Amino acid sequence: MEKQSNYKELSEDEHIKDKSDFLRGSIKDSLKNPLTGALFPDDVKLIKYHGSYQQYDRDLESERKQKKLEPLYQFMVRVRAAGGVTTPRQWLVLDELSELYGNDTLKLTTRQSFQFHGILKRNLKPTIQKVNEVLLSTLA
């Protein structure tokens, strides 16, 4: 009985994590859905544990509303670098990815990580795969 009462006290996000199959959720299906640039609502919350956030271009919001289009969804992908250090090859790959899939910026943070912005849903998988290939990670 104690476990049930504690379970009820969990936040909505904790309930989503609890039923997510080790943070998998339905992210795979969300990424395959060609009808929208967004992820399913529960997956939007889960991807932060994979080092990414769903965003949209606010500058285009009113123009897209007038045309009855959904917001221009895009993603921020965070790359962890132990001690904030990368090899020259890792740096070159991150720079290439920012040009190829992002909005041509690579942000350095005060938390020893890098951020790509403007990644479209269809480019999330190849971006993260390439990050992993050079032995870096997006996991939070």
Language model regions located:
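Feature of Fe-S/electron-transfer and energy-metabolism proteins
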Residues: 1-140
